Amino acid sequence: MDPFAGTGQSKSYRTFGNVFQRLSMSGNPKPLAKKPLLLPEASKAIEFWNYRDVIGGEEAEQERNERASRIAISRIASSRSSIPEYRQAIMQHLTKHVQQLDQLAEW
């Protein structure tokens, strides 16, 4: 028997729609869905995932910056006429790493 046929006992989506329509028209101003219950463990898990996303975002941004500087150095190195620019880019790159090492040493 076809459940979507128009004759007989129909278990189509229309009957569910009628149920939802009756519930929505019942005059009850409160929504049927309740707020989810958050346990302390759940809030700790949420804080952990937010922390992980922040740390992961900073690490990804740092990797993108390092990759961009490596690409810039390789492009400058590929053109022979720009030796001073190449040296300057290398010095900037090394300066960044030295600054990072200084920050880690202070930590």
Curated annotation (Swiss-Prot):
Compartments, as annotated in UniProt: Ascus epiplasm
UniProtKB keywords: Cell cycle, Cell division, Mitosis, Ubl conjugation pathway
Function: Component of the anaphase promoting complex/cyclosome (APC/C), a cell cycle-regulated E3 ubiquitin-protein ligase complex that controls progression through mitosis and the G1 phase of the cell cycle. The APC/C is thought to confer substrate specificity and, in the presence of ubiquitin-conjugating E2 enzymes, it catalyzes the formation of protein-ubiquitin conjugates that are subsequently degraded by the 26S proteasome. Appears to play a role in spore wall formation.
One GO location term (cellular component): ascus epiplasm
Source lineage: Eukaryota, Fungi, Dikarya, Ascomycota, Taphrinomycotina
Protein's GO biological process: anaphase-promoting complex-dependent catabolic process; cell division; mitotic sister chromatid separation
Knockout consequences: Abnormal spore wall formation. Abnormal spore wall polysaccharide composition during sporulation. Irregular spore wall thickness.
Assembly description: The APC/C is composed of at least 13 subunits: apc1, apc2, nuc2, apc4, apc5, cut9, apc8, apc10, apc11, hcn1, apc13, apc14 and apc15.
Name of the protein described by the UniProt record: Anaphase-promoting complex subunit 14
